[in-house]
Amino acid sequence: PGASLLDKVSAKIVTVKVDNKEALMHTVSPENIAHRVGVGVRHAGDDGSAAFRIPGLATTNKGTLLGVYDVRYNSSVDLQEHVDVGLSRSVDGGKTWEKMRLPLAFGETGGLPAAQNGVGDPSILVDTKTNTTWVVAAWTHGMGNQRAWWSSYPGMDMNHTAQLVLSKSTDDGKTWSEPINITDQVKDPSWYFLLQGPGRGITMQDGTLVFPIQFIDSTRVPNAGIMYSKDRGE
């Protein structure tokens, strides 16, 4: 547990025995096989959460590592459930990580319990022109704790369809804005469900911000695509 991320573990097969007898062996890779040490950033039970899933990782212009993920408080199941978007921040290349932040959490919005205001499957993007960091996720309001994939319907308002929301940080991931709902800008009203592609987005050379998306169209068929902004996310 105390190993450094810079450490490596090397292994080499010297002999192989079958029925306690040394077998003929052809060495494919004569050099030692080296693996880096993996360090768990989040573990079941941390911060009172049953599970952490759907990670994404980005590096800011200052070299800060920002890792996002679902904070699944009650179990590891998908939305709809009590789920927030968590973020871990490291300024030393991943050796140590600061206390978890919550860029997106909806609590008891609209008078419904947190388990019917889940937000998750995040994607993160660093605008390399400004060092503004964006996190996008799907917010599901209501749905009676049914799986969001089948409980989001055509329309635009939060009582009928999942909402696409953003949060941004302009101080290298230390603090985060209130949720920014962009559903009206990017969703076709005929689609059943629109959400981001979990993981990370990119900044193109001309400054265009690009996030992967997925959506269920009017035929109930899942599709993949992108959404983009040419005005710094405005």
Residue ranges of model-derived segments:
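Asp-box/BNR beta-propeller blade signature and adjacent active/binding-site loops
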Residues: 18-19, 23-234
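Generic N-terminal initiation segments characterized by hydrophobic and/or small/turn-forming residues
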Residues: 2-3, 183
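Short glycine/proline/serine/threonine-rich loop/turn segments at secondary-structure transition edges
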Residues: 3-11
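Accessible peptide chain termini
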Residues: 1-2, 234
